[in-house]
Amino acid sequence: SPDYQISQSYVPHTNILSTNFVSEENEFAVVDFMPCYHLSDASNCYRPAEIYRYIRRIKGTPRFKINYEPAPDYARGKTIFNTTSEYIETYSTSNSKDRQYLYSSLPLHNILEQKEIVLAKDEFLLLSYNEKVIPVNIEREKLEYCRTLVYWLNWTDRTKKFTVYNDVIERSLLVLKLMSFYNGAV
């Protein structure tokens, strides 16, 4: 919206992106992250094919719309939407096995119809390649955020520090870590 001044930055020492929307009367932040953390066995890292979006109300009653237009299977076919009470399932007519699930604390029909949303409290969205068997709610989202934050802070704390260009080097290391496989290949 032209009413908002928008700024983006990473949460320091992490791969968690924060986008801030500020106007005279309203302010909110959109925090995007892919979960990444160690399970009970410290050698294994949990990295599901998921993206969380946490929408944090800071002041006022911000208004916005969500433009959800997925193009599964590289947009080779028409996108099919199936809405349940828990999620929006999407897949392509060219490959019905490649499915995505959008979970949200916001009304799903408002997302699909791109209706204006009034942010009265913190909300979340989760885009996943897997249907969830456990309940997806804002408490689960906050837990995933905390685990991911701790993972990245611990990881960057263990990296070498440089006296010159450390911020740029650390950002490069974080991006490379995101793109690396479990065996170390990039």
Which residues fall in each region the model found?
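Acidic, mature catalytic/reactive cores of soluble proteins
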Residues: 1-186
